[in-house]
Amino acid sequence: MAEEPALLRIPPEIRMLIYDYLLDNGGTKDISIRNQSRSEYEALRSKTKRSVYNIMERSIAKKSYETTYCAEPEPRRSMDVAIMHINRKIREEASHFLYTKHAFHFGDDLEAVVPFFADKTPRTRDLVREISLYKRSPTNAIEPDSCDWSSVCRSLRNLQSLDKLTLVIEGARPREPWDGPQSLTVSDFRLLYSTRHESLEWARELASIGTIREVVIVADIHNLPNPESNMMLVLAAFSSSIETSLVDFLRDDLGIPARMGQPQYCGVGVFGRSKKC
């Protein structure tokens, strides 16, 4: 019979302090999950045990390549997860600390969400309390994320204990007033939704999850030249309404527990970064 690890022979409260130290992510509760670059994946390909998937390069070439996900190391101090491989009991205890005490930020690497949670056991998935996602502009025809978004929402239905989803929505509008509607009302959103306008199909998917206790909406607004096309006019008006009438529509009409959040996180959008977060 295998000897019990020394770690299990010390009081549980001491073990919790050890987990707290080893799984400290540089003093922050945030863990960023992202796609590995092509070069990173090729260098570590033979060692990976995680699910692999294909993504498109964010370049003009738009080539597809195989990759997997990884945790972005915290510059100040990286977690030491080796302790989780000692035995099953220690892994269960450490997993409880790792997944309940941290928020997982996927940014706009939505491709990583489904494999990340698919690689976890149902018990581990139920430990996750908080995640954040970056939703590219609903009118973004250059880098649409509609297929990934549908898969993400189906995956999130399996997170039975998810307390908080922070959704950063990309938008763009001119710095000065423009000719055309300056914002959208709740009635406007109702019309767009009822006609299945592409700008709100993502909300239909989000409403189908039904298990999230709180959805925090944050706008990431970039500068836009004076809008001249119908698509740009919709984008500008939509962007002005993300944290106001859109939140009201999501909450009151779709039953999503939405509220406005603080702009603490920016993703990487096709309009470029407008501020440092």
Task: Go through the PLM ranges and name each one.
Residues 1-130, 136-142, 262-277:
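Short, surface-exposed structural microsegments at secondary-structure boundaries
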Residues 1-4, 25, 123, 130, ...:
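Eukaryotic C-terminal
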